[in-house]
Amino acid sequence: MRTFVTKLLGLFLVVLAAIAIGAAGSSQAAVVSYFANLSGPNESPPNASPGTGTGAVDVDATAHTMHVHAVFSGLLGNTTASHIHAPTAAPGTGTAGVATTTPTFAGFPLGVMAGTYDITLDMTLASSYNPSYVTANGGTTASAEAALFQSIADGKAYLNIHSNVFPGGEIRGFLIPLATPTTATSWGRIKSLYR
């Protein structure tokens, strides 16, 4: 009898944990994270800059925000601008106009060869976009947000850091989705604890 009660209690805890994970997953489902490996060879055309960097972008369609974080070093020139370009004609290749703030992200470290940047943009504000991007994508911030988030999801957006040596961009990287655990994989992990 005690074994049956223990198993029943264990099953109850598994179900309770699955419900909690499902609730946590659904409350965070709107946030999607992307990563970019920034380098000169990723530019179009490629360049020989020894500069490197990483970018992380979290888009939240529910909160209408986009968090941008970048770390870079080893540039040959001093930074002049940074922003996200979108959409390219094909995923992972080509060039596109500036989609986000022009001439650069607010507060981006300019005149340096290495730095760190972190900002959360309110995507309901026109100041988060290049005005021509808004015009080309329906004329409202809502339509521009939808277009930009879709371009990022489609692999047609890249983070670019420009310098005085490479005005068209010294290092860039296309935004690719980060692998995130799903409710199904979390449920599988919970079940494996009781096998």
What residues fall within each predicted segment?
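Bacterial N-terminal signal peptides that target proteins for export
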Residues: 2-13
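Secondary-structure junction/capping motif
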Residues: 5, 140, 185-186
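C-terminal segment of classical bacterial N-terminal signal peptides
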Residues: 15-26
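N-terminal leader/targeting pre-sequences
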Residues: 25-179
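Intrinsically disordered, low-complexity regulatory segments in eukaryotic proteins
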Residues: 178-186, 195
